Design a protein with these regions (language model features):
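Short, solvent-exposed loop/turn segments enriched in Ser/Thr/Gly
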Residues: 77-85, 159-163, 274-280, 340
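Acidic, serine/threonine- and glycine-rich low-complexity intrinsically disordered segments
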Residues: 148-267, 271
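Short, hydrophobic/aromatic beta-strand segments
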Residues: 83-85, 94-102, 163, 175-181, ...
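Short aromatic-acidic-glycine turn motif
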Residues: 105-123, 189-193, 302-312
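N-terminal, Lys/Arg-enriched amphipathic/low-complexity engagement segments
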Residues: 4-63
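C-terminal functional regions that serve as terminal interaction/effector modules
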Residues: 2-13, 17, 284-364
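Intrinsically disordered, low-complexity Pro/Gly/Ser/Thr-rich segments with frequent PxxP/GP/PP motifs
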Residues: 115-158, 313-343
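Asparagine-centered strand-capping/turn motif at beta-strand->loop junctions
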Residues: 74-82, 87-107, 167-171, 283-288, ...
């Protein structure tokens, strides 16, 4: 288990109103993000066939290498074990490619357990900290026009499989552009070779669970300036819509519309930004005449929340925060005189609810 990062302490608070929205946001890391979380529950209704593709990322690129992150989150309620895995099909006639630098965290847990912590928080912390396990894919050799298997796992009935894989696709030979497909595949038979599943993805279920394939995996969010000693501020991140007017918030970047069109229709908004890194820049103005300590908290605004935060090179687990009366102080920052910026990165645990409040106060 690679998610041994220390856990911060939860507390209580009454968050200040009104909220301020994120000022602006733009994509950060160009590592691709594929999110496979719909259908989340695999049963006779959502997964009627013997096997199928849960989601895919279709890639065409002139680059010499492409970096990927794939997050999956599926619950087996089929009444029998399921085989779930990750494959890559090279569809190019002009080159061979190779899957390298694979790191992954896979959690298979009873779906009736505390999956927010046992799977979601663990995936977020290990990915954000860079402590996922190295993995030698099942097919490490160069792939021509064929399907390679990265890994397959058995998921018992009544269990969740949550995973994050990071890897790099490199050109092994040839000089033509990349054309390949990454798939999450599943089969009711343990004897099925998941390499043979090359169908289009299952239809999205009626639940609001997200899925999609985006050419980036990080949000760079700028929140409005905080003034030391002034009114306590609560900023609202990871929201579905703005508080007033209903227009999309600035940080809603992982939408069905921004999902790579090569992967076709069927994407669903990733409002909570599961699998993505959410990097916050907080401008702080200190005109008090002396350095001042500022406290930064996170506070759930849509239901139960957990995750991880990176401060510099250190990563901490954010504990389960059940209600909007719960909070976790993630940092104490000594603001110098004048204008400075405090930066930190968040990753939301699978099964969390958003929006998330970022609460800023001056230490008394």
């Amino acid at each position: 288990m690679t998610c041994k990062q220390p856990e911060l302490t939860a507390g209580k608070m009454d968050a200040a109103y009104p909220f301020q929205e994120v000022a602006s946001a733009e994509p950060g890391s160009r590592r691709r993000l594929m999110l496979s979380d719909n259908p989340e529950v695999l049963d006779t209704g959502s997964f009627p066939e013997a096997g199928g593709t849960l989601w895919h990322d279709v890639v065409q690129s002139d680059a010499d290498q492409v970096k990927h992150r794939v997050m999956g989150w599926h619950i087996n309620q089929t009444g029998q074990p399921l085989q779930v895995g990750l494959t890559l099909e090279n569809q190019s006639e002009a080159n061979t490619l190779q899957i390298r630098q694979i790191k992954r965290e896979v959690r298979i847990v009873d779906a009736s357990s505390n999956i927010l912590v046992d799977a979601g928080q663990c995936l977020a912390a290990s990915c954000l900290a860079g402590t996922m396990d190295d993995h030698a894919g099942a097919d490490c050799r160069p792939l021509a026009q064929e399907v390679g298997l990265i890994e397959a796992r058995e998921v018992p009935h009544g269990h969740l499989i949550g995973f994050i894989y990071e890897f790099t696709v490199c050109r092994s030979s040839g000089d033509g552009p990349f054309h390949y497909v990454v798939r999450t595949a599943a089969s009711r038979s343990a004897d099925t070779d998941l390499r043979t599943i090359v169908s289009e993805p299952l239809s999205a279920a009626g639940q609001p669970h997200p899925r999609g394939s985006w050419p980036f995996s990080e949000t760079l969010a700028l929140i409005p300036e905080y003034e030391v000693g002034g009114t306590t501020h609560n900023y609202r991140a990871l929201a579905k819509s703005r508080q007033f007017g209903g227009s999309p918030p600035a940080d809603l970047l992982f939408t069905a519309g921004s999902s790579d069109p090569l992967s076709g229709g069927g994407a669903v908004n990733n409002t909570a930004q599961f699998g993505a890194i959410y990097t916050v820049s907080l401008p702080i103005r200190n005109e008090t005449g002396a350095p001042a300590k500022v406290h930064i908290w996170v506070n759930p605004r849509g239901g139960k929340y957990a995750g991880a935060v990176r401060l510099g090179k250190e990563v901490f687990r954010i504990p389960v925060l059940p209600t909007n009366k719960d909070a976790c102080r993630i940092a104490e920052y000594e603001a110098p005189e004048g204008l400075s910026t405090f930066t930190f990165s968040l990753m939301t645990a699978g099964e969390s609810n958003t929006p998330l409040g970022i609460f800023v106060t001056t230490s008394s």
